[in-house]
């Protein structure tokens, strides 16, 4: 996605309100080797990168969006490095011990990148539902789902483990107008839009005086764990 100041502000509000990224990091943590150098591929503004740091030696956060990386650099903590560029070309000097692809990339692409850049496990976090949640109409997520990932891995004969879980990632709003801007920003329908009344019907009372509205979103996710050694060179082409 193309990051904007507004989309970044929305996500930072949601991340501060919920333990979404912490929950994902906690699921990955037990499977990380000791003192690991972990890559958060397609990190966005780096909320997951920061959440992963307590569980490893170093996190390298990579994203192609300059504004997203600029935002992360403004909130960096010790042990996290932010790099701006294409994952395909920003290979590390030494292979990563682990790589995380959270809601990022086609499965085939992530396998190819991981084979070249990682010597250990890779973690794919995928949506465990089939349609976009913030659109006016029914918009398919296509191949960016857990079901699609499982089909690809089965077809390629790559062994994996999978863990299904949920994490609350609702969106707080300071006003109804902010909620309208959010739905306009994330609506993937080509012709349909939500009215103010339809938007209001999706909202609940906000958690504080600052945030008077809240959009609940218990996100169903799948965590796929794959050993890089199980990916053949032919499959990584």
Enumerate the language-model features and the residues they cover.
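Conserved alpha-helix/loop element of class I SAM-dependent methyltransferases that forms part
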Residues: 18-35
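Class I SAM-dependent methyltransferase Rossmann-like catalytic core
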Residues: 4-20
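Conserved beta-strand signature within the Rossmann-like core of class I S-adenosyl-L-methionine
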Residues: 119-132
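A short SAM/SAH-binding and catalytic strip from SAM-dependent methyltransferases
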Residues: 97-111
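Short conserved loop adjoining the S-adenosyl-L-methionine
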Residues: 89-94
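Conserved class I S-adenosyl-L-methionine
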Residues: 35-44
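Class I SAM-dependent methyltransferase SAM/SAH-binding core
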Residues: 45-86
């Amino acid at each position: 996605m193309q990051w904007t100041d507004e989309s970044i502000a929305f996500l930072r509000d949601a991340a501060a309100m919920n333990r979404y990224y912490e929950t994902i990091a906690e699921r990955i943590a037990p499977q990380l080797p000791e003192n690991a150098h972990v890559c958060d591929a397609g990190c966005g503004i780096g909320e997951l990168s920061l959440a992963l740091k307590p569980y490893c030696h170093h996190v390298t956060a990579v994203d192609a969006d300059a504004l997203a990386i600029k935002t992360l650099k403004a909130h960096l903590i010790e042990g996290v490095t932010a790099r701006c560029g294409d994952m395909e070309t920003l290979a590390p000097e030494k292979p990563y011990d682990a790589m995380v692809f959270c809601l990022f990339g086609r499965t085939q692409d992530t396998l190819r990148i991981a084979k070249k850049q990682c010597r250990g496990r890779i973690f794919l976090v995928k949506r465990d539902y089939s349609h976009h949640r913030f659109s006016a109409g029914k918009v398919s997520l296509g191949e960016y789902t857990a079901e699609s990932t499982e089909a690809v891995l089965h077809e390629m004969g790559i062994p994996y483990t999978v863990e299904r879980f949920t994490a609350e990632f609702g969106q707080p709003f300071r006003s109804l107008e902010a909620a309208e801007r959010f739905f306009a920003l994330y609506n993937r329908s080509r012709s349909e839009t939500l009215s103010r009344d339809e938007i209001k019907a999706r909202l609940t009372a906000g958690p504080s005086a600052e945030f008077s509205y809240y959009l609940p979103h218990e996100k169903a996710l799948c965590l796929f764990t794959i050993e890089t050694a199980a990916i053949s060179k032919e499959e990584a082409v």
